[in-house]
């Protein structure tokens, strides 16, 4: 590794204007499926309504498990995952995704058991199926900045977002 002085001049610049710090995580307000059933080998479309206060929604991802596995003690055997395309040019607040069900996936009742959302300033929020806290709504997990202490706090609370279930048929 050799280092030597360059002839390029040092460049300095100043950023001006009003800045608004992005301290809040984005929020998912609704999740709706195109149908409550899907056949193996097909896909199931869904819409996620989400918003962010300053920088905008950056990324949304999800996981789904069979109901039995979501309620059971072991790790997932049947597991679906994916992400939602976020179009920054057309940020209407509604993001469309798709769950691809392969021919070998288990038939029966499934639940979207985990959603992650982040904004373009890397603030995130997770929504999880946590039956010990709520059997009807997702539990929201996120970090929140406390202006009084200057610290980030990790919080968990029941959200207003109802759990989403679907059935896979053969």
Can you name each region flagged by the protein language model?
Residues 1-7, 121-160:
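Beta-sandwich strand segments
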Residues 51-76, 108-109:
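Solvent-exposed loop/turn segments flanking beta-strands in beta-repeat/beta-sandwich domains
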Residues 88-100, 106:
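Aromatic sugar-binding surface patches on proteins
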């Amino acid at each position: 590794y050799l280092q030597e002085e360059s002839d390029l001049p040092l460049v300095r610049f100043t950023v001006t204007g009003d800045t608004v710090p992005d301290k809040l995580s984005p929020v998912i307000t609704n999740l709706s499926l195109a149908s409550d059933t899907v056949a193996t080998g097909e896909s199931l479309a869904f819409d996620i309504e989400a918003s962010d206060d300053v920088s905008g929604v950056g990324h949304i991802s999800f996981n789904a498990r069979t109901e039995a596995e979501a309620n059971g003690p072991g790790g997932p055997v049947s597991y679906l995952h994916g992400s939602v395309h976020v179009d920054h040019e057309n940020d209407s607040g509604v993001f469309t995704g798709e769950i691809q069900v392969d021919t070998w996936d288990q038939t029966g009742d499934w639940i979207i058991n985990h959603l992650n959302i982040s904004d373009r300033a890397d603030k995130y929020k997770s929504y999880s199926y946590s039956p010990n806290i709520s059997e009807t709504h997702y539990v929201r997990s996120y970090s929140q900045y406390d202006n009084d202490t200057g610290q980030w706090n990790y919080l968990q609370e029941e959200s207003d977002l109802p759990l989403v279930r679907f059935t896979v048929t053969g």
